[in-house]
Amino acid sequence: MKLKTKKLLVAGLVSTMLLAMAQPAFACTGVIVGKDLTTDGSFIYGRTEDYERNRTMRLVTHPRGEIKKGDKLVDVNNGFEYIHQEDSLKFFSTPDSSKKPKDMEQGVYDAAGYNEAGVGIFCTVSADCNDEIAKVDPYVPTGVNEASMTTFILAHARSARGAVELLASTIDKQGASMGDVVVFGDQDEVWYMEIYSGHQYVAIKYPADKFSVFPNAFWLGGVDLNDKENVIASKDVVKVAKDAKTYVETKDGLIDLAASYNPKELRDTNRSRVWSGIHDLDPNSTIPYDADRFPLLNDLSEGSEKIDIKDALNLFRNRFEGTDYVPSDNKAERNANPDKYKRPIGSINTMQAHIFQTKEGYPKEAPGIMWMTLGSPLNIPWIPIFADINDSSAEFKNDAPTYDANSYYWVASSVNDLVSGDREDLGDSTRAKVVEFEEGLMAKLPEIEKEWLELYAQDKDKAAEFSTKKTLEMEKAAFEFEQGLQKDLSKVSKADLIDHWARKPIIETINKGYMVGTDDLKFSPNKTITRGEFVTILGRISEVDKAKYSEVKDENIESGKYYTEYMNWAVENKLLPESAKAIAGEDLTREEMAYILTQCLKLKDNTEVKKAELTFKDADKVSDWAKDSVAYLTEKEFVKGTPDNKFEPKNNLTRAEVAQIIHNISK
């Protein structure tokens, strides 16, 4: 879960991590599936990182010793410091761009990765304690947080339990500046940890026979804090809850952590995701949407099949399929109709997703694969990343802070945006192509694994070279695949239409060939439209034979432009008001639009336009030559005035407004 922010600089013997703090956005979703519940005995754990679209994500490798003993990690915004006690291990991580625009909160957020000791981690799924707890043990402004913890844990942890102990000791000494859920795994076990308040936390060794789906809240119920083999807890976790008068005890006499530390009400954005996630992995679950409590540790229901890695990967694409709820990534839409629209797990706002698969037969130092998407997995294939890789492709580590055609994140994310522009028609077909590509990678994986394991038994360095080579090949294939999707989808949709009020009429005009984008990926719906653009649209609708209008009809018409023949057609057929002077590049006014459109309809369909009185409050501001046209178009409901009954004749039109008008006359 994104907080905000971090930047790592290394100069000489000192590495300084610049971290800017801000409030977290609560939208990440975590999952764990114990190895007894999976089809192949794998232990599975992962999360989505959700915050905002258009935020560069990368896959970056860090060689052993990149961070030196004595180097200091500093959060310059809140003052958190961590001094490295030894040189860093080799690891890879999935950070933000280090070159983000100044108007965007800064930070790297290493987020997730593997190190050479075989520890896989993700940080974090953010959460908040209740107000009463915060008064007793408030978050520490200078404490550790998600922006910093991933880096020093990957750099030094040598086991999953060791990762918990490292983070716990840091919280004991310096406190935590936010609430979080984190997960650490190695070859032997997976640990789940909740950080509740400034100094309180509990971690458990995750049982092999359970599964969990956990959005942004605390989920641990009753925990035996005396079970030192399977539990690591802060010493005052019970005392703080009692002092806050929020302490809740289970029937077994154990502290109920979720009931004691959570806010009283579960956010509906959390309820929708935990409910849909449980039902996705356990189709026979009977837990209702309005359940008083959702358990962290779930059993598979009778009749439900064991969980495959594909099930776990597809969980992060879940959009309430098979339910009565409608997925919405738009908060305003959800608030307007909360019974219908719900926040899904699979969201366009997912910046990256990662799922760790600890596999039987893999070596201790590289115990599994991290499946990864840079961008939302909705329309991006999962790529298997071996734990021992030495490098990633130029496209996967591209640091560009804004759109770059050579960045995997940006190209793949544009595919998500293009599909979201017309999800109704493009969603299923694009997903089918993504899954087909994904399954192709999965089909090749066993042979790659076999050769890698054979090499690993002989020479770990050669095995790492091999896994790096194969990973680069898969990354290259995935990039080319997403480029192909981008090229095809950009012909029928645009990437800047998500949640736009005119999305559907815009798509209609694009697919009918009446309007085109301002470039391959953008429609620019809020950009004003020029006279030449509007005349061109009407010419396309009227199926004008351009060959008949090659001769320039007015001194203001420039030859060789996209609009030349259409402007000649408009002049010859007297479609333009005299005031327009056949100047194509000027922005179109609303009254000019009304006149030109009406003249076109008269020419095309022999439409009869009668004189009529205007009822708009600003009718006196409409030019005499446009009044009949405005009256006709409003009577036919082809155009409308403002909510306060004005026509605003001298205002310009946007491309979106024109698309809506074209849709109206096409009914």
Protein language model regions, located:
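N-terminal secretory signal peptides that target proteins for export/translocation
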Residues: 1-4
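Sec-dependent N-terminal signal peptides of Gram-positive bacterial secreted proteins and lipoproteins
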Residues: 6-24
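A contiguous strand-loop segment
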Residues: 28-145, 166-291
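Short, well-structured alpha-helical segments that form the helix of a local strand-helix-strand
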Residues: 163-172, 312-316
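Glycine-rich, aromatic-lined ligand/substrate-binding cores of catalytic
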Residues: 244-361
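Substrate-recognition/cap regions that form aromatic- and gly/pro-loop-enriched pockets
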Residues: 329-454
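Histidine-centered catalytic/metal-binding microenvironments
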Residues: 430-492, 510
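Feature responds to low-complexity, polar/acidic, surface-exposed segments characteristic
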Residues: 490-504, 511-591, 597-627, 640-652, ...
